[in-house]
C-alpha cells in the first residue's frame, strides 16, 4: 500500500477563519504541506491540473519542481496530466526536465481532464477529447522512450525526426 496526498490547489477562503491567502502564500502553503507529507512518511505528493477558478493548479510541473527542490524522498505525482489539452511535445519537455531535476521521483498519471471551461480555453470539444488524449499519450510515450521520433497525427503539427532528448 502506498500513501499519497493530492491537491488541486483550491484558492478560496479558509472554511474556519474566512481568510483567503494571497496566491503566493497559497503556493507556499502547498509546498509546506508537501514537505510535511515527506516528514510524516507519505510515499507521494500529487498536484492536479485545473484551468479554472477556484483552482490555481494550471502549472503542475512548475509546482512539482519547487516541491522537488525542497524535498528529497517523496514521489512527485501528477493528478492528472491532461494530454487532451496539452501539446505532448511541450508536456514531455516539462516533465522530463522535472524527472531529471528530482532524481527520477516523478510519477505521471495521464487523463483527459474535465470541465467545459478547460475544454473551451483550449478549444477541445467533447467529441475530440478522448482522441486527443490517446494521440497525445502515444506521442508523449514515444518521446519518453525513443531517441528519434517522426510523427504525424491529427491534432498537432508533424514532427520530422525529432531529436529531443531529455529523458
Residue ranges and their predicted role:
Residues 1-71, 75-78:
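N-terminal beta1-alpha1-beta2 module of alpha/beta enzyme domains
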Residues 2-23, 85-155:
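Flexible, glycine-rich active-site loops centered on histidine and acidic residues
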Residues 49-52, 83, 125:
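Residue-level detector of alpha-helix boundaries and kinks
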Residues 51, 81, 113-115:
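Catalytic metal-binding/acid-base residues of hydrolase active sites
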Residues 78-86:
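Active-site nucleophile and cofactor-binding loops and adjacent substrate-binding regions
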Residues 157-162:
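Active-site glycine-rich loop that binds ribose-phosphate moieties when present
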Residues 164-166:
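Conserved small/polar residues in nucleotide/adenosyl-binding loops
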Amino acid at each position: 500500500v502506498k500513501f499519497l496526498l493530492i491537491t488541486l490547489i483550491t484558492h478560496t477562503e479558509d472554511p474556519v477563519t474566512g481568510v483567503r491567502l494571497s496566491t503566493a502564500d497559497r503556493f507556499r502553503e502547498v509546498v509546506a504541506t508537501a514537505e510535511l507529507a515527506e516528514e510524516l512518511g507519505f510515499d507521494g505528493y500529487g498536484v492536479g491540473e485545473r484551468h479554472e477558478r477556484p483552482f490555481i493548479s494550471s502549472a503542475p510541473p512548475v509546482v512539482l519542481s519547487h516541491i522537488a527542490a525542497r524535498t528529497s524522498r517523496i514521489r512527485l505525482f501528477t493528478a492528472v496530466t491532461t494530454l487532451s489539452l496539452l501539446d505532448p511535445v511541450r508536456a514531455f519537455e516539462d516533465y522530463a526536465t522535472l524527472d531529471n531535476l528530482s532524481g527520477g521521483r516523478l510519477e505521471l498519471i495521464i487523463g483527459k481532464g474535465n470541465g467545459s471551461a478547460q475544454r473551451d480555453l483550449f478549444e477541445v470539444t467533447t467529441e475530440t477529447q478522448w482522441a486527443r488524449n490517446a494521440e497525445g499519450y502515444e506521442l508523449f510515450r514515444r518521446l519518453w522512450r525513443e531517441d528519434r521520433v517522426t510523427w504525424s497525427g491529427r491534432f498537432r503539427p508533424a514532427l520530422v525526426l525529432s531529436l529531443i532528448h531529455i529523458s
